[in-house]
């Protein structure tokens, strides 16, 4: 089985089941005769662009990113470690030296409701158009953590 076929199978599993962990995905693949290493599975999930969301009971589950309306690219989500909100502003935390990279990604995405960004070494201030938009973006980014 090649990479594309394996990733299609992963997408099918995610759409059919409420899957919460990579181990669950790996077990489903094994039941179908597909053996993958943890590293390969992690890479596949990142390339597919899966999001982790919370259901009504607060349990995490994987979802295909095309099923969730999000203005943020998978690259943006990759850098965010933590998100906090203060009114109409978001504070995004990254690894040391990555905040400016994240700022450039967000600025290049040209999201209409983001007025601007200010980056430090590991912290990024995102200024949103209003508080409701900031709340929505906070929820969106936190779901991917």
UniProtKB/Swiss-Prot annotation:
Belongs to the ArgR family. The gene is argR2. GO terms for biological process: L-arginine biosynthetic process; protein complex oligomerization; regulation of arginine biosynthetic process. It comes from Streptococcus pyogenes serotype M6 (strain ATCC BAA-946 / MGAS10394). It is found in: Cytoplasm. This is Arginine repressor. It comes from the Bacteria. Signal peptide: none annotated. Pfam families: Arg_repressor, Arg_repressor_C. Regulates arginine biosynthesis genes. Pathway: Amino-acid biosynthesis; L-arginine biosynthesis [regulation]. HAMAP family: Arg_repressor.
């Amino acid at each position: 089985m090649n990479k594309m076929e394996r990733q299609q199978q992963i997408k099918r599993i995610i759409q059919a089941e409420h899957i919460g962990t990579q181990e669950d995905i790996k077990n489903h693949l094994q039941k179908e005769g597909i053996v993958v290493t943890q590293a390969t599975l992690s890479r596949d999930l990142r390339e597919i662009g899966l999001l982790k969301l919370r259901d009504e009971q607060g349990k995490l589950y994987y979802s295909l990113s095309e099923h969730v309306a999000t203005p943020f690219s998978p690259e943006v989500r990759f850098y965010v470690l933590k998100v906090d909100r203060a009114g109409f502003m978001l504070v995004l935390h990254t690894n040391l030296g990555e905040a400016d990279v994240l700022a450039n990604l967000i600025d290049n995405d040209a999201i209409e409701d983001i007025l601007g960004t200010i980056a430090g070494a590991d912290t990024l201030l995102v200024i949103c158009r209003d508080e409701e938009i900031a709340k929505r973006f906070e929820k969106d980014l936190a779901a991917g953590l």
